[in-house]
Amino acid sequence: MIKHTLLMPFFFSALPAYAGLTSITTGYDFTDYSGDHGNRNLAYAELVAKVENATLLFNLSQGRRDYETEHFNATRGQGAVWYKWNNWLTTRTGIAFADNTPVFARQDFRQDINLALLPKTLFTTGYRYTKYYDDVEVDAWQGGVSLYTGPVITSYRYTHYDSSDAAGSYSNMISVRLKDPRGAGYTQLWLSRGTGAYTYDWTPETRYGSMKSVSLQRIQPLTEQINLGLTAGKVWYKTPNHNFNGLQLGLHLKWQL
């Protein structure tokens, strides 16, 4: 606990002195797996700041994974930079490090490129490298498109994964976001389906087979500066040994500054 407390001053001091803080978010996520697959708890704090053409994100998370008689705790720090190069090119660079446990990926690096080449259309491509507990490494390449039609944003993304000790795998994800007629609130739905090398958990069985998931999120403004986020979802795993599922619940508060 002392180590985690000492990380907080560094977390806040990581912002450049000239950066303009735009939001602070705190949240909690919980996943309960069926059968004897345990559960996962995650609490986090997040800062977003604006520096000229760049948007900076800093996130500090504390997680716990319980599985039968095994219990794991870990801390993760991550950062990301969105940079708007011009009216049609935006990039996102992200990096994260965590304790060497099954709770989080030990190392995570991603680079995304967003191209606004057509009106009301955004193309995305990118690469992600992830190193998990027990030195499992995954390379991922993704491409997708988002369409903006009035209050609705519809997105599709395809991702191909290469794992260091499992066959290649893939995922397809569709999301639909509906903005409220007035205010900053919105509701978003995610649907995904794919094979399992990228769904790494600390048990090797989750690296094989297939999965599908559904998630629904509601962002509800409470005041002009505070938004409440509520998320509920479910994921189904089909592995060579047996099938199981996970129920996901999340809550966060975001202060706009």
Regions found by a protein language model. Name each.
Residues 83-89, 203, 256:
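Short linear interaction motif-like sites in intrinsically disordered regions of transcription factors
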Residues 18-30, 49-58, 91, 187-190:
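Transmembrane beta-strand segments of Gram-negative outer membrane beta-barrel proteins
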Residues 177-178, 253-257:
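Short beta-strand-to-coil "C-cap" segments at the C-terminal boundary of structured domains/repeats
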Residues 20-25, 38-40, 244, 254:
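Beta-strand-dominated lipid-handling architectures at cellular/organellar boundaries
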Residues 47-49, 81-82:
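Short, exposed beta-strand/loop patches in secreted or surface proteins that constitute
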Residues 1-23, 52-55, 88, 257:
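Cleavable N-terminal export/targeting peptides
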Residues 52, 84-86, 90, 118, ...:
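Residue-level recognition of beta-strand termini and adjacent short loop/turns
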